Design a protein with these regions (language model features):
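Glycine/threonine-rich beta-strand-loop-alpha-helix active-site module
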Residues: 1-11, 15, 21, 66-124
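Gly/Ser/Thr-rich active-site loops/lids in small-molecule metabolic enzymes
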Residues: 73-90, 145-160, 281-308
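Glycine-rich oxoanion-binding loops at beta->alpha junctions
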Residues: 3-50, 98-99
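A glycine/threonine-rich phosphate-anchoring loop and its flanking beta-alpha core
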Residues: 92-161, 173-174, 360
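Accessory alpha-helical/coil subdomains and C-terminal extensions
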Residues: 118, 122, 144-239, 243-246
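Proline/glycine-rich low-complexity loops and linkers
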Residues: 24-25, 29-33, 86-115, 316-345
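Internal helix-turn-beta structural module
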Residues: 282, 293-369
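Short beta-strand segments
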Residues: 2-5, 56-60, 86, 123-129, ...
Length: 369
């Protein structure tokens, strides 16, 4: 067997006779190590025989780690496009439509290859996307795909990644696909699609329910705002603050005490996949969760006693090594003492830098999801 994971995430746990090779590669922008690891995986699939069973474990990050561009597209061009997509503010589902159509392994191609070799295929999937659709997770290496080459071109156009920005090799290949000169992703009417089974075994909502259970055990009252939250991270933060403010205003004259003199804590929990649009010329540091939290901090000065945490369930938020960030009254006091201007950090998309200064970064290491 073979595992492809992010650099630093090979936990070196004992494996029976070490028959499972662990390869590390880059995320979120793919690299040559990921390309070689994916080629190794392809060799395993090509060696399958009739009635073999292929078990595929899929989780977030696979769109980058499992990387094998079609022959017409170089790794250099794939890296360039990935960087543009990440800066564009496109939601992950849209990004993955493009990725599927320039990949020899995603968009159901892994499943298709295994079935054509005569194998039975089961994919066990941990979802990190809204909607929990197998085709959206890691760009769906074993899943059917309803999108088209034209959809991919439309997405690049919508996010202004057209000629002069996207590599010409990629635009040319996508255009060939629209006129039938390149193979489509795995479709529902293909016989191979019936031989691949996808099972989503963990979702964002399960994480929210686990957090809810813990908070209830601590005596708090919990409000789940949903597990399908999308949009620009900073705007989502402002929207959720309005929900909190509305709750406070409606209930400020009510007694929510568990017992006289002690008010019950209120906890608001949400999950989803936000986006961050990075303007040209801005480098930025951090990820969606950290930016969400910095915007929440910047716009919540009127809410006394507020504490907040935002983190990725896989332990990595964007470009750095932190899972996310948090703030409480001590962090707020420290930021005020340092006289940091959170708006400057927000404009620079440097949430990582802000929370590094105030000691609010959250580090979990690999969570193995």
């Amino acid at each position: 067997g073979l595992v492809i994971t992010r650099y630093g995430h090979d936990v070196q746990r004992p494996l029976p006779d070490r028959k499972i090779l662990v390869c590390e590669a880059a995320h979120p922008v793919p690299d040559e190590a990921g390309l070689q690891a994916t080629k190794n995986l392809l060799h395993i699939v090509q060696a399958l025989q009739k009635d073999d069973q292929l078990l595929v474990l899929i989780s977030g990050g696979g769109s980058s780690l499992l990387t094998l561009p079609v022959a017409e597209i170089s790794m250099s061009d794939l890296k360039s496009l990935t960087q543009e997509l990440l800066r564009s503010g496109a939601p992950i589902e849209a990004m993955n439509v493009v990725r599927k159509h320039i990949s020899a392994i995603q968009g159901g191609n892994l499943g298709r290859l295994a079935v054509r070799a005569g194998a039975k295929v089961d994919a066990l999937i941990i979802s990190d996307v809204t909607g929990d659709q197998p085709g959206d997770i890691a760009s769906g290496p074993c899943a059917v795909d309803d999108s088209t080459f034209q959809d991919a071109l439309n997405i690049l156009d919508r996010y202004q990644i057209g000629p002069g920005v996207a590599p010409a090799s990629i635009l040319d290949y996508l255009k060939k696909g629209t006129i039938g000169q390149a193979p489509e992703t795995l479709k529902r009417d293909e016989p191979e699609s019936l031989m691949v089974r996808n099972h989503v075994i963990a979702t964002s909502m399960q994480s929210l329910l686990a957090a809810q259970k813990y908070c209830l055990e601590q005596g708090a009252q919990v409000h789940i705002l949903g597990d399908q939250i999308t949009g620009e991270a900073a705007q989502v933060a402002r929207d959720q603050l309005e929900i909190v403010r509305g709750y406070v205003e409606q209930n400020q004259n009510k007694d929510f005490a568990d017992r006289p003199g002690k008010f019950r804590r209120q906890v608001f929990i949400s999950g989803g996949e936000t986006t961050v649009t990075i303007p040209q010329g801005v480098v930025g540091r951090g990820g969606r969760c950290s930016e969400f939290l910095l915007a929440l901090y910047a716009h919540s000065k009127d809410l006394a006693g507020l504490s907040a945490l935002a983190a990725d369930t896989d332990g990595i938020d964007g470009s750095e090594e932190n899972a996310g960030a948090y703030f409480d009254q001590e962090i707020i006091h420290h930021a005020n003492t340092l006289q940091l201007d959170e708006k400057t950090y927000l404009d620079a998309h440097d949430a990582y830098g802000f929370f590094l200064e105030v000691g609010g970064l959250v580090h979990t290491g690999p969570t193995l999801t």
